[in-house]
């Protein structure tokens, strides 16, 4: 099961998708860049990060510290 939670438009050819998914009974949150071709659906790129909720809880405070 995969659910898109949020889509952030970067520009005409790029979006960032935040998705929640389950794999082998585990929950993951994936933040990934998508390329938007002139015709067709947005396509995922290799640029992204998929972590379980506990890993995101550890990472988010560190990101907040870096960006101030």
Predicted regions, residues:
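A short, structured beta-strand/loop element
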Residues: 16-47
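Mixed-charge, Lys/Arg-enriched low-complexity segments
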Residues: 49, 53-68
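Short linear motifs in intrinsically disordered/low-complexity regions
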Residues: 12-13, 52
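Gly/Pro-rich active-site loop or hairpin
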Residues: 9, 47-49
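Generic detector of short, locally flexible boundary/turn motifs and exposed helical patches
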Residues: 13-17, 58
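Negatively charged, low-complexity tracts enriched in Asp/Glu with abundant Ser/Thr
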Residues: 1-11
């Amino acid at each position: 099961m995969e659910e898109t939670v949020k889509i952030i438009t970067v520009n005409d050819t790029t979006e960032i998708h935040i998705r929640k998914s389950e794999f082998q009974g585990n929950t993951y949150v994936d933040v990934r860049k998508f390329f938007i071709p002139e015709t067709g659906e947005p396509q995922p790129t290799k640029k992204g990060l998929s972590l379980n909720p506990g890993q995101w809880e550890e990472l988010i405070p560190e990101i907040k510290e870096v960006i101030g």
